[in-house]
Amino acid sequence: MIGRLIILLARAWQMGPSLVLPPTCRYVPSCSAYTIEAVSRYGALKGGWLGFRRICRCHPWGGSGFDPVP
């Protein structure tokens, strides 16, 4: 149930603000797609943690490029 909520929030981001704002993704796949895949694969707790860590790495001094879900 919590996993579905996390996925719903990530999809809402993809369909809402992400469409209006200029593309600034540093990673492939995007953080929202990464979080959706992580929660689908590992569940709400571990997948949510992986998504949170990924979002925290998304800043000008962080990495970039291809970063798949482990």
From Swiss-Prot:
Keywords annotated in UniProt: Cell inner membrane, Cell membrane, Membrane
The organism of origin for this protein: Rhizorhabdus wittichii (strain DSM 6014 / CCUG 31198 / JCM 15750 / NBRC 105917 / EY 4224 / RW1) (Sphingomonas wittichii)
GO CC annotations on file: plasma membrane
Taxonomic superkingdom: Bacteria
Main localisation: membrane
Name by which UniProt lists this protein: Putative membrane protein insertion efficiency factor
Family: Belongs to the UPF0161 family.
UniProt-listed InterPro entries: Membr_insert_effic_factor_YidD
Membrane topology term: Peripheral membrane protein
Function text: Could be involved in insertion of integral membrane proteins into the membrane.
Subcellular location: Cell inner membrane
